[in-house]
Regions:
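Short loop/turn segments that connect beta-strands within beta-propeller blades
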Residues: 59-63, 110-115, 164-168, 221-226, ...
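A short helix->beta-strand "capping" segment at the edge of beta-propeller domains
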Residues: 16-26
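Short loop/turn segments immediately following the C-termini of beta-strands
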Residues: 45-47, 98-100, 144-147, 165, ...
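Beta-rich, blade/repeat-based domains predominating
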Residues: 24-39, 43, 51-52, 73-93, ...
Length: 318
């Protein structure tokens, strides 16, 4: 059973928390990661379509975010909707392009002189490309909905997919029978339908993902070939997390979770303790990223990032 720990420094955290306003060209901040130059990188799907889907940078803590580049649009839809992002070891950026009508893509973007040099499609035909992380030459991508699966009970099916970083133009069918689907889950909550959403990896090679609708969080062990060989539910349905969305792990093995409908930022320690770093004051928090001694949280329902200082925790992030 998880132990709940409300931090003694919670009041200090709230008092010292800051808000960063994104530029007008960002209407929906979401996925985040840190690049090899130590900059915070932010994906913005811009759901209202008044602006193109883009990637922004924050070069220093509490600085001013700037647009880095527009994500090359899908030819069929005419737009890009970047959500989850992560970097590979050679500095390439992997982007979940969350499209409707099974037009989603996983992109690999390489750079020259800080500008896009090449944009390639790793996988296509995705129902709901959401989060992505790189681990040992593999890319682990969540699909919160597998719309192709029709269940008699109406429950929603979701999946964790694995691709090789060298894959290009892989077409998926969006069912657990896909060769690339290494873990699937069913959401039982009839009020909140989304399934596997956020994804994170730690230094020991474990993978974490959460069922958004049920409030469950999984710790997964991949085998030598990258496929999942063991799963453990570390947060249970109806428990502490209402809707676990984006997540990340720091170098101390702490797991941070943005709880969108719970309006909270949680941290699960390696010993299983659950801390609420902040409860309230977000606008549909979707993604956390540990950077330079603080947790930066994307307000998916707004146009800002919340900066929550940490109390003596490791400041590197995976």
């Amino acid at each position: 059973m998880n132990r709940i720990l409300f931090l003694a420094c919670a009041a200090v955290l709230s008092a010292n928390a800051k808000t960063i306003q994104m530029p007008p060209t960002c209407t929906t901040p979401d996925g985040m990661c840190v690049d090899s130059k130590g900059r915070l990188v932010i994906a913005t799907p811009n759901n209202d379509r008044t602006q193109p889907g883009a990637v922004f940078r924050l070069d220093k803590p509490c600085g001013t975010p700037v647009k880095w580049f527009d994500v090359p649009p899908c030819k069929e839809s005419g737009y890009a909707s970047p959500m989850g992002i992560c970097f590979g070891p050679a500095g390439e950026l992997y982007v979940c392009d969350n499209q409707k009508d099974s037009k989603g893509r996983l992109l690999c973007i390489t750079f020259k002189d800080d500008k896009i040099d090449k944009c390639e499609v790793v996988a296509e035909g995705l129902d709901n490309a959401n989060g992505v992380k790189y681990l040992n030459g593999k890319l682990y991508l969540t699909q919160a909905f597998l719309y192709s699966v029709k269940r008699g009970d109406g429950a929603a099916t979701s999946g964790l997919y694995m691709f090789s970083a060298s894959d290009r133009n892989v077409k998926v069918c969006n069912t657990p029978a896909d060769e690339q689907c290494v873990f699937s889950d069913v959401t039982r909550n009839p009020q909140i339908r989304g399934g596997l959403n956020g994804v994170a990896v730690d230094a020991k090679g474990f993978i974490y993902t959460g069922n958004y609708g049920d409030g469950r969080v999984w710790k997964l062990m991949p085998g030598a070939d990258g496929r999942i060989i063991k799963s453990e539910e570390i947060l249970h349905a109806g428990g502490l997390s209402v809707t676990p969305d984006g997540m990340c792990v720091d170098c101390s093995g702490n797991l941070y979770i943005a709880d969108m409908r719970g309006d909270a930022l949680q941290r699960i320690l390696p010993d299983g303790k659950v801390e609420f770093l902040r409860k309230g004051g977000f606008v549909r928090p979707s993604e956390p990223c540990v950077w330079k001694g603080a947790v930066y949280v994307a307000n998916y329902g707004g146009t800002t990032l919340e900066v929550v200082p940490l109390c003596g925790s490791g400041c590197c992030q995976r």
